Amino acid sequence: MEPIPSTILTGFLGAGKTTLLNRILHEEHGLRIAVIENEFGQENIDNEILVRDTGEQIVEMNNGCICCTVRGDLIVALTSLAQKRASGEISFDRVVIETTGLANPGPVAQTFFVDEEVGANYMLDAVVTVVDARHAMTQLDQHEEAQRQVGFADKILLSKTDLVDAAAIEALKTRLHRINPRAPITTSDFGRAPISDVLDLRGFNLNDKLELDPDFLRADDHAHDHGHDHEHGEHCGHDHAHGEACTHHAHGHDHHRSHHTDDIAAFVFKSERAFDPERLDQFLGSMVQVFGPQMLRYKGVLSMAGADRKVVFQGVHQIMGSDLGAKWGESEIRGSKMVFIGKNLPKDVFIAGLEQCLV
């Protein structure tokens, strides 16, 4: 049986996650979706399957946030769903996990890679973050959880854009791209985002696609004199030094000279020289061991000495994996591009260390 694609839907309090989710659940899209909801502090049916007339199955838990403190509960819920599906008791095509507004998506994402049974039954597709356009600037200023949710995102949906003017939206987009230049941003008025904006994003696939916001790259190039830029990343799944999730963020490099300096920020490394595989593996392993809790997402498409294929790596916190990508084209310029998103990461240490790994 193919692993069940799973989406983590996150966003700060009141951003509009539930509005969006309710619409997805009731839309005629032909998909059977099992939703794991976390209604913190409300009375819900614990570990019960509720079958709505649309045919989706929903698991509601009231044991606290879906985060590392209750990771065991999430594993139990996912395992129970998979068993009920295998026995024919319920039927669903995919899972959406809605986190509370205060949840850190990191531990939720890690669950798919650290638990063997969950990893065998499910495939983490993406983290989708809903951002309240009206209140986001204040939330990002005051709450590191809001910054972490943006930093982890594979896709950002802006809600309540009808309540602010175009200039405010552009300023917010600039700030979001500085935190996470890897995640595309789309607008979602009152939960009207197409379902394609939330499902089948393949954000955690090991592929050789690494697209970054061009304005971020231009600003970053101007900010540094070396021949690299600095970006951020994604993730896959072998364990490099098991870890709990991050409750920290990365110190902001203010590429856009905004008035806001966010704790979580991204940087990019680029080079047209090839890496020595052994040196790079050793260096990245040591960085993950030391800074893993601060490393939210990271991804790279790499050129390795003596290899005719690209190497793709990505990680979440201490969980890092790699795989072979496509062959380099005959006329393609070989090179490496890596992006790191995190809190207070020593960028200069990373850059200098990566340069030492080049042939």
Describe the predicted segments one by one.
Residues 2-139:
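Nucleotide-state-sensitive switch-loop elements of NTP-binding domains
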Residues 5, 9, 29, 41, ...:
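Helical mechanochemical/support elements of P-loop NTPase systems and associated helical scaffolds
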Residues 51-54, 146, 202-205:
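Short, hinge-like loop/turn segments at secondary-structure boundaries
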Residues 83-197, 202, 212:
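Phosphate/Mg2+-binding loops and adjacent switch elements
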Residues 155, 164-329, 333, 343-359:
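C-terminal accessory "lid"/substrate-recognition subdomains
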